[in-house]
């Protein structure tokens, strides 16, 4: 595995004071690094569909699905999908948020890989796992570009194969 930390820019006080934002756009702009990340996120796994969590998860999940010959399924913020959906809510630092997936996005027994850019508190990932399972599909793993280990998000995903390419 390659260390891509030099291609991830720290942006202090974004989007609000006290937050150190991890900007992955320099990594995405580097063809070799982006290709390696896409290859490694799904490496060694067998799956039928790849879930990408809005918004940066889309950037990573769609090429993983393409490279693997799998389908891509977007998990979006509430109100952004046009057909019947399942929804799951999760807590944020102040308040809560809701994500949705189309009710017909998976066939029962589909093997699903969840992909996102960052594993932080684990709330969003846990809600995505709940959505997939509600459809009758099986989550085989969740893969993230980076994990903010000090937030212990992995602890909110017990029994799940959690993979991260970088830990900060």
Language-model features: where?
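PRPP-associated nucleotide enzymes
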Residues: 1-168
């Amino acid at each position: 595995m390659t260390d891509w930390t030099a291609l991830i820019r720290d942006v202090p006080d974004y989007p609000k004071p006290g937050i150190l934002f991890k900007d992955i756009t320099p990594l995405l702009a580097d063809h070799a690094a982006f290709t390696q990340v896409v290859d490694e996120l799904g490496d060694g796994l067998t799956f039928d569909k790849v879930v990408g969590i809005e918004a940066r998860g889309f950037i990573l999940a769609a090429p993983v699905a393409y490279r693997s010959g799998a389908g891509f399924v977007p998990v979006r913020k509430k109100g952004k999908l046009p057909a019947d959906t399942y929804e799951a809510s999760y807590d944020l630092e102040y308040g809560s948020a809701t994500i949705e997936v189309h009710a017909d996005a998976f066939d029962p027994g589909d093997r699903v890989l969840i992909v996102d850019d960052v594993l932080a508190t684990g709330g969003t990932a846990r809600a995505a796992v709940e959505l997939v399972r509600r459809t009758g599909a099986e989550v085989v793993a969740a893969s993230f570009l980076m994990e903010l280990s000090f937030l212990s998000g992995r602890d909110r995903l017990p029994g799940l194969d959690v993979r991260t390419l970088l830990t900060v």
